[in-house]
Every structure is written in C-alpha cells, then in structure tokens.
A protein has these predicted regions:
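Residues that form generic nucleotide/phosphate-binding pockets
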Residues: 12, 25, 61, 65, ...
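Short, mixed-charge, low-aromatic patches
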Residues: 13-22, 45-48, 65-69, 89
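A solvent-exposed, acidic/Ser-Thr-rich amphipathic alpha-helical stretch
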Residues: 28-84
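A beta-strand edge to alpha-helix "cap/lid" segment located at domain peripheries
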Residues: 66-153
Length: 153
C-alpha cells in the first residue's frame, strides 16, 4: 500500500535535493508551478519561476534556487491533507549569494498525490521580497491608484 499523501509530501520536504528520493516520489509527468504559470520578466530574475514537468524539473528548480540563495531557515508551521490534496504553510529566510541580502517570506505549497506519487505542485512565496534580494540598484516610479501621485520605490 502506498504512503498517504501527507507522508509522501513530508518525505519529499526532507529530501528536496536527493535524486533517488525525488525520482521515487515524483511522477514522470508531474507538473511543478513555481510562483506563477508564466512571467518572462520574473523568469529572468528567478529562472525556476513558471511551469515545468517531471522529477528532473523538481531537482533542477530547487538546485537553481539553492545556488542563488543560502537557506538560513525553512520552517513548516502547518501541513494538512484532504484526499489527494496536501497543503503546506510556513516561512523561510534566505540570503542571496550574490549580494548578501537576507529576505524572510511566508510560503504555501499545494501538492496533489496519487498512488504515492506527487503529480502536481504549486509553490507561492513573497516574490517581491525574494526578487528584491537580487536588486543591486535602481528604483521604480509606481502609481497604484488612478488619480493619485506616483511614488518612487
């Protein structure tokens, strides 16, 4: 009998970069959605952003993340499941390897597990904060509401 969906996700979270474990837990056609489905500008900053497929995508995406950031803390605060759906919530602290900027962000992960295999994963975080950990210089002029004065960030 395969492990329960929550057990599968727990094992994956403990072995994110272990090819043997990832290949045994992730279905060959699994979908990995990181932050959004497609955003060309964000993808330039964080190449793993968007949609990719298969166990190698899980390994490549997380491998790319951890070459750019030092994982200083990753804490799961809540994890629960309903049928094949597993929800994971928590927060992390990363330090950018390029600039040494530290960012803290909440995260959420939706995982679907069928027959003991991850078939879908969607990861969300504070993309503005994490992307800003790579911001060397520059600013934006932003206008958030019609008729209001633009401001610089």
């Amino acid at each position: 009998m395969p492990a329960s969906p929550i057990e599968v996700v727990g094992q994956w979270l403990q072995n994110l970069l272990d090819p043997g474990v990832v290949n045994s837990l992730v279905a060959p056609n699994a979908t990995y959605v990181s932050l959004n489905t497609e955003d060309a500008e964000l993808n330039k900053i964080m190449p793993w952003a968007g949609t990719s497929r298969g166990p190698q995508a899980f390994l490549d995406n997380l491998g790319a993340m951890f070459t750019r950031w030092e994982n200083q803390a990753f804490k799961v605060t809540t994890m629960f499941s309903s049928d094949e759906n597993v929800a994971v919530f928590g927060d992390f602290r990363y330090k950018s390897n390029s600039l040494g900027k530290v960012v803290t962000s909440p995260f959420s992960i939706l995982v679907k597990v069928f027959d003991g295999k991850v078939t879908y994963l969607q990861f969300f975080e504070d993309s503005y904060a994490t992307a800003a950990s790579f911001r060397k210089d520059g600013s934006w002029i932003v206008q958030t509401e019609p008729g209001t004065k633009p401001f610089q960030v």
